[in-house]
């Protein structure tokens, strides 16, 4: 059997040597960065694949070692700009656990609400960039982005998270506007979901990730759940206010592991997040006024320790290994990011896939390039 090699460029990697440039459109986050795929082809079928990362290294982990803990929260959302709030929140939760800090109840519910809004906006971009018919949903996403900007001051990088809570509360008018936008999204989502599902059925059986491969690689989030791995930290761990919302957490799972299954799971988690966000907003209204952070010393020092924290972000499970020697900066803060494993899973799933299905295969693994090379 005679095979040939092909180097595929994604995003800014098109400026390097390449045999094929894969254009995913201006909207898809995988296009914002640089990634190469080294493919082995037999006629028009992929028989081998290797993801070449390292072209957009964010140096986040090294920068953390030279920043104090407050400054780290301002940097923590830079490597995955799609899951920005969840990224800074995961770091804050890890620091708080190491210091024994318990945020106020209003802060916990506000964080839960913002985390679900972040999950919705991330999912909507991945859905809206999938097929042209789904782009109409991006108008609703734009309204959610404007609400985030009103609440945090940052459209892309919220930077509202503080050690022990949030920088400012979410006011009643903001909660009312959020309810209006979520109602609009609930109304428009079924038609968009149908358009995406119909378009992706053409790729049934392509880029299949088996359950065993998903487990061995350590994939999480919607990619893992589309391969039969029923894991979700919101349901399985006592994080934020999720234990009180347990009855509302319906985790969509599929066993097919192919392109349509991944989009099915991604679409399925949006209504769940809408329900959780609405429930969190109702609870905040019931709580009324109250503090959203705790007093901190001028210099924050984490006691000498090694600790590990996790959070379920829009793309999957993020892990934070914090090693402190009692100084105002960490000795090491290592990130375990979902995009890194998702790209490894992409390479594992491609053999047997027609080259014509490469673009939807890549977009169905839901990654941000900066989150790979952090």
Locations of regions flagged by a protein language model:
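Active-site bordering "gate/hinge" segments
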Residues: 1-374
């Amino acid at each position: 059997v005679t095979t040939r090699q092909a180097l595929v460029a994604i995003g800014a990697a098109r400026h390097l040597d390449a045999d094929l440039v894969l254009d995913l459109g201006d909207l898809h986050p995988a296009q914002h960065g640089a990634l190469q795929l080294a493919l082995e082809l037999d006629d028009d079928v992929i028989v081998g694949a290797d993801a070449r990362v390292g072209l957009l290294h964010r140096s986040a982990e090294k920068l953390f070692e030279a920043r104090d803990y407050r400054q780290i929260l301002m940097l923590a959302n830079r490597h995955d700009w799609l899951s920005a709030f969840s990224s800074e929140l995961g770091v804050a939760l890890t620091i708080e656990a190491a210091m024994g800090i318990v945020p106020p109840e209003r802060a916990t519910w506000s964080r839960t609400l913002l985390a679900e809004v972040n999950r919705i906006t991330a999912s909507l971009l991945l859905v809206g960039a999938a097929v042209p018919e789904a782009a109409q949903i991006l108008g609703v996403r734009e309204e959610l982005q404007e609400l985030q900007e009103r609440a945090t001051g940052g459209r892309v990088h919220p930077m509202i998270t503080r050690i022990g809570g949030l920088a400012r509360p979410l006011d009643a008018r903001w909660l009312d506007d959020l309810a209006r936008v979520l109602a609009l999204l609930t109304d428009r989502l079924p038609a968009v979901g149908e358009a995406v599902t119909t378009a992706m059925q053409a790729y049934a059986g392509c880029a299949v990730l088996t359950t065993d491969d998903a487990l061995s690689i350590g994939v999480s989030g919607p990619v893992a759940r589309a391969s039969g791995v029923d894991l979700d930290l919101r349901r399985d761990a006592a994080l934020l206010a999720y234990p009180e919302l347990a009855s509302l957490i319906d985790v969509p799972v599929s066993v097919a592991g192919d392109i349509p299954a991944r989009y099915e799971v991604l679409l399925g988690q949006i209504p769940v997040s809408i329900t959780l966000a609405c429930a969190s907003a109702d609870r905040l209204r019931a709580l009324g006024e109250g503090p959203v952070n705790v007093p901190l010393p001028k210099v924050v020092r984490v006691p000498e320790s090694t600790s590990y924290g996790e959070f379920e972000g829009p793309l999957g499970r993020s892990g934070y290994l914090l090693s402190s020697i009692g100084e105002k900066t960490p000795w090491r803060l290592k990130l375990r990011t979902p995009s890194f494993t998702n790209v490894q899973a992409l390479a594992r799933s491609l053999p047997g896939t027609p080259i014509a299905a490469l673009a939807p295969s890549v977009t169905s693994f839901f990654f941000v390039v900066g989150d790979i090379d952090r």
